[in-house]
């Protein structure tokens, strides 16, 4: 886990519990099989950005995901019931976060997707994306975050806002 604020965007890697206690906003990037290890109480009331993607090759098969009955971010929200989970940064390779951004209004500006059941988490994510040079595609509630997951057309490729809107709208629940 990493900690940081939207004021200075400073981040540092620390132990899970320490990060959770110190964070104003937390970023969760763990294999899904490790969700149960994420501390719950220290993250209560905080925005938690979920960058996770389901890879059954790494995570083992998770029936609810395989059947399209759950989303990765929904599983995290269920584990952190008093946190404000937002799907974020899952459809970009980490190296590109610092290289693919461009000023607002730039033609063909890259878009990143988000979804959350908490408007303040969605707003935070959109602001962060913009500060880093990306447009936002807000898919609404976490129940729609599957549209950004692996093997869907909104996942993993560089897309403009218009392209991502079209691709996520056309996505099938089961790949």
Put a short name on every predicted segment.
Residues 47, 52-103:
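Rossmann-fold NAD(P)-binding glycine/threonine-rich loop
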Residues 21-24, 32-41, 54-70:
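Rossmann-like adenosine-cofactor binding region
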Residues 31-34, 92, 118-120:
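Short beta->alpha connector loops
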Residues 13, 84-88, 137-141:
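General beta-strand structural signal in soluble alpha/beta enzymes
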Residues 29-30, 51, 88, 115:
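Short, well-ordered coil/turn residues at beta-beta hairpins
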Residues 5-9, 66-67, 102-106, 154-157:
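Short, hinge-like loop/turn segments at secondary-structure boundaries
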Residues 107-175:
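Active-site-lining helix/loop region of Rossmann-like oxidoreductase modules
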Residues 1-25, 29-34, 41-42:
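Conserved N-terminal Rossmann-fold NAD(P) cofactor-binding segment
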């Amino acid at each position: 886990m990493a900690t940081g604020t939207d004021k200075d965007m400073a981040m540092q890697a620390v132990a899970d519990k320490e990060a959770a206690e110190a964070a104003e906003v937390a970023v969760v990037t763990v294999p899904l099989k490790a969700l149960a290890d994420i501390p719950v109480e220290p993250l209560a009331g905080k925005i938690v950005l979920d960058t996770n993607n389901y890879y059954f090759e790494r995570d083992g098969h998770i029936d609810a995901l395989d059947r399209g009955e759950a989303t990765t971010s929904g599983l995290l929200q269920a584990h952190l019931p008093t946190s404000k989970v937002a799907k974020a940064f899952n459809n970009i390779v980490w190296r590109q976060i610092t290289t693919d951004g461009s000023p607002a209004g730039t033609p063909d500006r890259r878009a990143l997707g988000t979804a959350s059941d908490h408007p303040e988490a969605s707003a935070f994510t959109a602001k962060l994306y913009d500060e880093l040079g990306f447009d936002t595609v807000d898919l609404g509630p976490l129940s729609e975050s599957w549209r950004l997951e692996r093997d869907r057309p909104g996942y993993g490729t560089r897309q403009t806002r218009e392209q991502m809107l079209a691709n996520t709208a056309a996505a099938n629940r089961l790949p």
